[in-house]
Amino acid sequence: MTPFLSVLTSVLAWVAAMLVAASLGVIGPARLRETWSELRDRLWDTRRVVAVLCVVLIASAVGRPSLLDVSRLFGFQATALIYGLEGGFVAWVQATFATSELTAYFSWVYVYGYAFLLSFPAIAYLALPRTVTLRRVLVAYALNYAIGLALYTLVFAHGPRNVMPDMVTPLLFATQPDVMALTSEVNVNSNVFPSLHTSLAVTVATFAVLTREEYPRWTPVAVWLSLSVVVATMYLGIHWLTDVVAGFALAFGSVFLAYRFVDPRENAVGSDDGGEQGRSDPGTGADG
């Protein structure tokens, strides 16, 4: 088995196990059974935003190599500016806090925890009686990727491990070299501003806080994992603090726009035009 397939299989196995555990512990068997009985209607209700997200992801995957060349030639060269703003902050983080235990934890979080963090909301919010929150999450994901791709094109910047190789160690690849086979398929060294790991993780945490009445057990898990991902991006030498700050801004902006773009009254399962009248609307609390 190639390193890429080995890592991908491991990630899928870990994420599948965590999704099962979280679905049972957070959503609960009763709500899962109800979701299964109404799955077709709920999926139909989200078809448009799923299509938009798929288009954005495909465009990102196909266009990234060409846009990278555009960024390298015409983009704003931000590496020196970022380094001038924060200097050796990431190097200080590693020099001060790096231990074998923390490196193992943050490496796991960056790959496995992050994949789970982004996957579980799709199941959790699909299990709500109304799909408005799920549609907002998917729109926020699409906005993160679309705006992130645009910024990657406009801003060309290398990460701290490339700028300060004598001071910053690429801890993720030093401890788990096979992971590079997977990350190289979705990232390049100049894809650092903003940190999409940060923006997407913070997006999930923000929705978890907004839906805490529906899923009180999920909120602390999501916030902890999200903050762990944020720290991991710097601890592992992948992103600058500046990238992380920009990631927070992108996350909050994407959530705000998702709430503006998705009308909670539109085509909701259980509404009159959904064909299932008389159902109560317990999803109100989930809309924040």
Task: Place the predicted regions along the sequence by residue.
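Interfacial/capping segments of alpha-helical transmembrane domains
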Residues: 66-87, 162-163
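Membrane-interface interhelical connector segments
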Residues: 158-186
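Transmembrane alpha-helical segments in integral membrane proteins
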Residues: 25, 108-129, 198-218
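Individual transmembrane alpha-helix segments
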Residues: 93-115, 186-198
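Haloarchaeal acidic low-complexity proteome signature biased toward cell-envelope/secretome components but also
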Residues: 1-63, 77-80, 212-217, 253-288
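Interfacial segments of alpha-helical transmembrane regions
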Residues: 114, 118-156, 218-222
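Membrane-embedded catalytic cores of phosphoryl/pyrophosphoryl-handling enzymes
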Residues: 175-288
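Hydrophobic alpha-helical membrane-insertion segments
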Residues: 51-75, 141-157
